[in-house]
Swiss-Prot record:
The modification Phosphothreonine is found at residues 378, 1282, 1309, 1513. Limited proteolysis of myosin heavy chain produces 1 light meromyosin (LMM) and 1 heavy meromyosin (HMM). HMM can be further cleaved into 2 globular subfragments (S1) and 1 rod-shaped subfragment (S2). CDD domains: MYSc_class_II (cd01377). This is Myosin-7.
Amino acid sequence: MADAEMAAFGAAAPFLRKSEKERLEAQTRPFDLKKDVFVPDDKEEFVKAKIVSREGGKVTAETENGKTVTVKEDQVMQQNPPKFDKIEDMAMLTFLHEPAVLYNLKERYASWMIYTYSGLFCVTVNPYKWLPVYNAEVVAAYRGKKRSEAPPHIFSISDNAYQYMLTDRENQSILITGESGAGKTVNTKRVIQYFAVIAAIGDRSKKDQTPGKGTLEDQIIQANPALEAFGNAKTVRNDNSSRFGKFIRIHFGATGKLASADIETYLLEKSRVIFQLKAERDYHIFYQILSNKKPELLDMLLITNNPYDYAFISQGETTVASIDDSEELMATDSAFDVLGFTPEEKNSIYKLTGAIMHFGNMKFKQKQREEQAEPDGTEEADKSAYLMGLNSADLLKGLCHPRVKVGNEYVTKGQNVQQVSYAIGALAKSVYEKMFNWMVTRINATLETKQPRQYFIGVLDIAGFEIFDFNSFEQLCINFTNEKLQQFFNHHMFVLEQEEYKKEGIEWTFIDFGMDLQACIDLIEKPMGIMSILEEECMFPKATDMTFKAKLYDNHLGKSNNFQKPRNVKGKQEAHFSLVHYAGTVDYNILGWLQKNKDPLNETVVGLYQKSSLKLLSNLFANYAGADAPADKGKGKAKKGSSFQTVSALHRENLNKLMTNLRSTHPHFVRCIIPNETKSPGVMDNPLVMHQLRCNGVLEGIRICRKGFPNRILYGDFRQRYRILNPAAIPEGQFIDSRKGAEKLLGSLDIDHNQYKFGHTKVFFKAGLLGLLEEMRDERLSRIITRIQAQSRGVLSRMEFKKLLERRDSLLIIQWNIRAFMGVKNWPWMKLYFKIKPLLKSAETEKEMATMKEEFGRVKDALEKSEARRKELEEKMVSLLQEKNDLQLQVQAEQDNLADAEERCDQLIKNKIQLEAKVKEMTERLEDEEEMNAELTAKKRKLEDECSELKRDIDDLELTLAKVEKEKHATENKVKNLTEEMAGLDEIIVKLTKEKKALQEAHQQALDDLQAEEDKVNTLTKAKVKLEQQVDDLEGSLEQEKKVRMDLERAKRKLEGDLKLTQESIMDLENDKQQLDERLKKKDFELNALNARIEDEQALGSQLQKKLKELQARIEELEEELEAERTARAKVEKLRSDLSRELEEISERLEEAGGATSVQIEMNKKREAEFQKMRRDLEEATLQHEATAAALRKKHADSVAELGEQIDNLQRVKQKLEKEKSEFKLELDDVTSNMEQIIKAKANLEKMCRTLEDQMNEHRSKAEETQRSVNDLTSQRAKLQTENGELSRQLDEKEALISQLTRGKLTYTQQLEDLKRQLEEEVKAKNALAHALQSARHDCDLLREQYEEETEAKAELQRVLSKANSEVAQWRTKYETDAIQRTEELEEAKKKLAQRLQDAEEAVEAVNAKCSSLEKTKHRLQNEIEDLMVDVERSNAAAAALDKKQRNFDKILAEWKQKYEESQSELESSQKEARSLSTELFKLKNAYEESLEHLETFKRENKNLQEEISDLTEQLGSTGKSIHELEKIRKQLEAEKLELQSALEEAEASLEHEEGKILRAQLEFNQIKAEIERKLAEKDEEMEQAKRNHLRMVDSLQTSLDAETRSRNEALRVKKKMEGDLNEMEIQLSHANRMAAEAQKQVKSLQSLLKDTQIQLDDAVRANDDLKENIAIVERRNNLLQAELEELRAVVEQTERSRKLAEQELIETSERVQLLHSQNTSLINQKKKMDADLSQLQTEVEEAVQECRNAEEKAKKAITDAAMMAEELKKEQDTSAHLERMKKNMEQTIKDLQHRLDEAEQIALKGGKKQLQKLEARVRELENELEAEQKRNAESVKGMRKSERRIKELTYQTEEDRKNLLRLQDLVDKLQLKVKAYKRQAEEAEEQANTNLSKFRKVQHELDEAEERADIAESQVNKLRAKSRDIGAKGLNEE
């Protein structure tokens, strides 16, 4: 399907099929068939790899991720070529194996293509996300499409089922299976949705619907939410898991419209009603009711909205994130309404649901001094009784004191609390189950319409195969169901394969793969199978689960390959037997099976239910009749038997009904896959998917496919694709049939010719051959393409070379012409020629222009005519094309109708022929059967009489023999069990081993005696003499049967002769058919050729249309050019007239001027050349236009005529060919139907022969039953011991994990402390920076004050200057008045002024110098402010780093929390394992107790043997000799029995001693367990405390971080303020500079007038000196601040160095921690070594047991050995006492070490307290491990030498531990030294801080002194100013 066709699917197209671009990319991907392979992988199951080398049966390959692996050659599997990537049907893969299937699914899943075909299967993978592949657009696109026409989809499966139902008139079924959470329920909904859309019954259903109800489509769809509410629940894998299976039948009418529907359910998980796992929850309806969406429900049911108030529904989770319970309640309620439930029915359902919740809250207590239960409060009982319509007192009485029928009387029975609780649970489960089944029945009644129904499609949604760690009765039922379904699939699949091969004429031996699973099915369901034995045990009152197990072992262990004894693994639930299913071996635990199968109820309460006032409840239990139901006269017995139906029998009955339904349908298979267990979209867990593919039969289907020919291609396609491999085999010119061509082609290739077969229409390939052909094709294509590329490159190079040569020749010609022109262009004659030439043609141009005008007019008229003609032709062509399209559509429709009619006709003819053949065959068979029946009935009657007598006699004998053999087997099994238990005792004490030998020898003697007795019993064969006569009679009857068989064989030979004749006729028919096929293929070939010609003509027509359009465009361009030509011509005309005028003027001028015409001649030449060029262009355009128009007219007319003729011819030929085709098809159908009829007759005859042979084989097999027994005691013991070692290893690993987690916790706490310390250092650095900022701020304030003083001084100078100016003005006026008088005085004053002026200039220079110094001070202050800004930025960076550290710390804290939670889970798992170990210990104790019981049973068996011997003596009383011999044997047996009893008593005494040891070991184990739990609690408390501390630290860090951010913001604000102040100061300083410059100018202008201002100038000089002093003071202050800043920087550097030192010390401590870790690992390794020694001891024990078994022949010396064993026992007791003393000494040593550790802890309490606590905890762990090892070793010591060696090893271990403790002590000392060094560093830092503080105080004191001096100087300055003012005033006054 191309991309254009996929557009019909809309947005779903990319999720259904690869695009063409992807397919092309996949085909061009590099691939090497010989090197690209799959190799096995531990994690990913299989990985892609490339083979590097092969040698010696091994393959070295490099995987995709670069890893090199070496595997066996048979483990390597080839990859498929790229054309098979993401293939839609995996059955078409050329290499069909597990990795190919897995990777195809994985790659499709990665592209979100979740549906894939695998032969008959449709495999769907759960996407865990919404995909747009289910909308109405997709439904419409799949409707009516065949499977091969559309991508894989559940809609395609549904539509194919629907179409098959309509065409084949056969019921269909869709089987949807898979694990929980794989998407079964969703796909079932989609199937129902599809049928509801495409097969809606229309308006009629809407008219007929009842008010309040929905349409039938709505009801079918709404049945799902109603059933989901009561049958779905949350599980670990799936939030909406269906806990029941269902088979939904959707019935259709004859026209394919919906008629009705019904539902059948299977295996509702009713145990979920009262019990749920921790991560699961109960059925949805309970939580929907409690959602409070309908408060009236809560009031009606007397419940709250809290699920935890009800015990039954609150054992797991109560909410699900993906489910809105309130909305679901409304959906359920509306579904009830749509389904037509009455309000009374709805309320009854809700009431029973609420009553079940109240049932779970009913409490009972034990009566004092009685084993009798009584109610503990009646409130919940009252509520539940009210809701159920019962009396509360009667309910409680029925629960606590039920009535039981004993004989013909009823007796009241007392119940204890446990029995009452069980009864309540059983009643709740039964009520819920019956209510659910009633709902299904009620829904079926609603969906049952009165409309006629013809066919149905069944949808089966059932759980897939289940293999859990704990498999019980429910898993057996589910797996049995899947086994039957898989057998059904296998049989169906291979029947289809068989039909395909038969249809294609492939020789094939029929293999019924369905029989592969028959052994397992028979083992479960046949008489004396598992189900049968279970039901038989349920009939016996004293039967238990163990008796059921014993019966299973007796009947099947060793007799059936599918029944095995399981290998119990420690840590997992015990398994009792294993079954080999098709999906794998499953271990089953049988605990509680009898109870589950019987499913008993309290019949007193059931009687109350039957009388309930709640109508629904009484109806649910109306037909219930328990085991105690009264008999109704003569029919009571039958009624009782029929009512007591077990769960297994009911399940088998339902399953048989289901299989009957499925066998009557045409099945379709859907397998749902769960990709991963984390519900992650797009992620595929390879091992999980492979497990499911095995379980759901996909790989089984592949196995069946590989047996046959999985790849098949039509001959035509094969020839087209692979002809390139050998083109000579199929010549191009001549016609060769596709089949013959394929045969020639394959015969010419170098391949294995047994790997393919030729059918009638297809060639069939074995797996792998198609991939080889693809590789050969790729190699051939690469060679051809390489050759084409080489030739193409050669042609292109030659063309390029030719162009270069032509270019060179052209250049040479141009060069020659240019050289010639350059040689003659300056000749005078040439110049004259150039001038005169244009003037000669002016007259000719006028004539030419006139002719051109005329021609132009004619061309224009012709063009208009051609345009009109062209338009007419275009209109005709459009109409012809429309007619052609209409004809094509009509032909297509007629072809479709004809094909449909042909198909229907063929089908009807086939059906008719088949029915006629069947009728004929049946009549013939009926006649034969009647004849045979007449002959056989007489013989049968005679034989039946004889056989009945013989059977009675044989049955009696077989019963007696079976009884004897059964008792013998029971005795043997019990003796085996006894020997097994004796062997277990031998492992503990050697004495018991020898006793066991003696017992076994005695037992062997008993067996020998029994064998002798059996030999004697054989004398009874004399009694069979009478039977031999009867056997002779039977042989006579057998002879008669043989005669009958001979008759049958004669009939068979006759039929074979007929068959040969029919085969010959078939061969003739086949030859005729082949001839007809060849004729038909020739006609098809001619038809294809004609179709190709039609397509070519259509393509030619389209090309002509394109050319017409191009010509039209060209005509338009020509018209535009013509228009441009007209304009150009007008311009030329105008130019010509202008030129003519100019020519006249020029001629006049020439006449006047004479020879001055050279310029005019050149102009005339140019114009003439232009005119000639334009005329040539116009002529060319006109000619070209006329030629194209004529060609177009001619071509158009020819093409139209030709197309019309071709269409007519093609239509006639097509009609003729279609007639011939239909005739040939009819003939071919007749021939094929005849052939099929003959083949079917042959198959039926062969089937009859096979059935007769099978019957004979069954008769023979019944007479050939054998016994098999296998003793697997040794393997079981080895398993147990390996499991024990495995568990101990797991315990060690868990302990190592705990220690690792504690170490991780310690490292995280250390990291937290380091982070805290770093944070404190950063805070200190921040404080230092803040202090520096504050000092800088203070300096800035001082500068501001200084600046204000300077401005005041400047203002004062300004005032002085203005005063001086006024004085100068006064002096000027005074000078003008007194000028004459004081000239001499002025001269002197002038000199003085000059002197003063010089002084003033000096003063101004001094002021300027002062200004420059102030400028320098300003720059220096600016630099300091910049430095402060850098410091501020650094503090900001530090704050950012702190933020980053805070985030990192948060991450670390989150990781630590996660690890803490993981450690918590690990602790819980370790606690669980400890509990499992305790249960194992109790099991061991129980095993010992069972051994005692077995000893007692052995005694009983001896007694039974004695009784059996006595019975035998009574039976053989006829012969006195045998009685005498039996008497002797009895005496011998009694003597041996006494010996055995004495030996057993001794063994019992030793067992009691060992029991005491076990009790002591148990007490020690309990102590260890209590110690572990206490330590775990302490660890929990420590972790909680650490968690709280870390949270507090996080809070404190958060607050400090907030403070840091606030301080940073404050610093930024201050910085901005300082920048603003600095800018203002700069502005003021510049203003002051300008003012000083103006003042200087004024001073210069007033130099002559400063005589009187000298005093003021002196004052100004003094003020200037004061200012200098002030500046010096400020500079000193600034220097002091600078020094202080430098000191602070040094302090920061010192703290940085100390931080680095601390980090270095942290690294050293981490290295020490690693050293401790390595020491811990060495201790763990030593522990593992001790475990290895323990396993060695166990192997030695096993060897000893083997030796004991080999020594069984020496059992006669048991009594003498017993005394020796007693002595050895005393020695062993002495040895154990010695070991006990050694243990006490070692415990004392450990206590001393503990004391030393305590002292070390007190010494290092201050510095390394935490480390010591860790070390102390580790020491305690080591002590516990040491004690545990000592106890285990003390118990496992077997013999003196082994014990001594073990003690030596323990002492060596103790010395090693002591050394390790000494190392730990050294580490503690080092840590103490480290703590002291830390203390010294802290003291040094404190001293440094004190010195810095004293320096700061000193600087502060100096600052205060400087400020005081400044104040003094300022006061002096003020005094001097005042004094100067006074002096100035006095001077003025004096003057």
